[in-house]
């Protein structure tokens, strides 16, 4: 009976949780290595949910998903569609989302679109449970859940219902805010582009409230082919021009070896909020911009509006608005990775004040067999992991780590656990 159950539910070498750019890239490399990965998630879900009219901030040549043969890059998809993906010409986010779907159909095994609700330790390695209650057994797991679990909303706004406060990532379309007074919180690309789109979608009034003392804009990128002196002075990278960006882009492994305090400081300061060069003209429709301001309190008024207490350079003020959109980014905190079993989560070593999971060589966490990809690894590997560009560095190395861990497990059994882990977590062999 036990043998029959084991055959019906074999132990998988690798389960990939998440089907965004990182999850799909990891699955493509794993499939090419013969690991037969199982991948869960709706392909490019967060990208499909973005409002129409948004554009990629990154250059097309820095926006490839990763497969080992480099056969399914964004340039290949664009060529197949008769689209010119050129340096300095922004591409619609919808085009990039469709590219991810195309990549999924060609480079990875069939994607199981169910949501994984739990990854827990088990004798074989891990038990992976889906939304409908099915549990798979896996020797290794790659957690590539993207950014949506890590939404950051300013503290004074968190207690308000979603009817009054949303994160910018909640909006597939902005038509529902037409005719309303909307306050957008933040000064980065998401805030500035959301505000511009709201103005174009017929919002009655749009304002920006941001702690930043000024708006920062990226400059028009220089030509790809330049003279040797210009190239030497400010080399192109997938994260923008300049030698600092080149180090972030080309050497995430070196970033990981920096002292923890240095990594934390750079993570907080590198590639800070800025609008794309092509957005600046569109943003001209937004005239109410309040910089150097922070929200200290928020409440719903008797006439169904939101009252914001705001502190700024000239003292305190009160704003009333119909809706608040928090375009305030994401925090890669382990506490927000709810898909991980609580006991497993508490056993992981962390880095930085936000308690991101420590990510070791080849993207393995401190729990053997649990691998991490994407935003969760940025405090360890640097700012490139906040962007699609980082998938190219991650995918092949992570799969190399999986293969190494499987060999270390020996004989196809469990990959092992931290010392004392079985007893501490109540896992029975």
Task: Enumerate the language-model features and the residues they cover.
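Flavin (primarily FAD) cofactor-binding/catalytic cores of flavoenzymes
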Residues: 2-43, 88-189, 193-201, 205-429
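Dinucleotide-binding Rossmann-like beta1-alpha1 core, especially the glycine-rich loop
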Residues: 44-45, 50-65, 80-106
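Flavin (FAD/FMN) cofactor-binding and adjacent substrate-gating region
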Residues: 49-82, 235-256
């Amino acid at each position: 009976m036990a043998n029959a159950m084991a055959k019906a539910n074999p132990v998988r070498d690798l389960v990939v949780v998440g089907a965004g750019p990182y999850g799909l890239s990891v699955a493509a490399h794993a499939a090419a290595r013969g690991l037969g990965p199982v991948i869960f998630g709706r392909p490019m879900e967060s990208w499909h949910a973005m409002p129409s009219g948004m554009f990629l901030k990154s250059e097309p040549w820095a926006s490839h998903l990763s497969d080992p043969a480099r056969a399914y890059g964004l340039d290949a998809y664009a060529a197949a569609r008769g689209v010119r993906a050129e340096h300095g010409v922004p591409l619609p986010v919808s085009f990039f989302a469709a590219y991810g779907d195309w990549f999924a159909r060609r480079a990875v095994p069939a994607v199981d679109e169910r949501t994984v609700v739990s990854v827990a330790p088990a004798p074989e390695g891990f038990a992976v449970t889906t939304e409908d209650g099915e549990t798979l057994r896996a020797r290794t797991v790659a957690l590539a859940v993207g950014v949506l679990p890590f939404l950051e909303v300013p503290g004074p706004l968190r207690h308000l219902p979603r009817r009054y406060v949303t994160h910018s990532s909640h909006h597939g379309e902005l038509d529902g805010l037409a005719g309303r007074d909307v306050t957008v919180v933040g000064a980065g690309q998401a805030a500035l582009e959301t505000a511009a789109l709201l103005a174009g979608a017929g919002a009655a009034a749009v304002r920006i409230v941001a702690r930043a003392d000024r708006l920062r804009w990226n400059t028009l990128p220089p030509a790809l082919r330049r003279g040797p002196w210009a190239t030497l002075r400010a080399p192109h990278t997938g994260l923008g021009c300049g030698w600092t960006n080149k180090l972030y882009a080309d050497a995430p492994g070196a970033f990981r070896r920096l002292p923890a305090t240095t990594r934390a400081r750079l993570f907080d300061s590198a590639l800070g909020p800025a609008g794309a060069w092509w957005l600046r003209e569109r943003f001209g429709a937004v005239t109410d911009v309040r910089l150097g301001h922070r929200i200290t309190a928020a409440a719903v008024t008797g006439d169904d509006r939101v009252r914001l207490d705001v502190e700024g350079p000239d003292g305190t003020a009160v704003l009333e608005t119909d809706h608040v959109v928090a375009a305030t980014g994401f925090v890669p905190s382990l506490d927000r990775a709810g898909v991980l079993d609580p006991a497993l989560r508490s056993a992981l070593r962390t880095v930085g004040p936000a308690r991101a999971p420590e990510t070791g060589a080849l993207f393995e966490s401190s729990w053997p067999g649990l691998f991490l990809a994407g935003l969760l690894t940025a405090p360890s590997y640097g700012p490139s992991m906040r962007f699609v560009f980082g998938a190219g560095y991650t995918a092949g190395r992570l799969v190399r780590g999986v293969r190494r861990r499987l060999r270390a497990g020996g004989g196809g059994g469990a990959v092992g656990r931290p010392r004392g882990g079985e007893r501490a977590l109540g896992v029975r062999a």
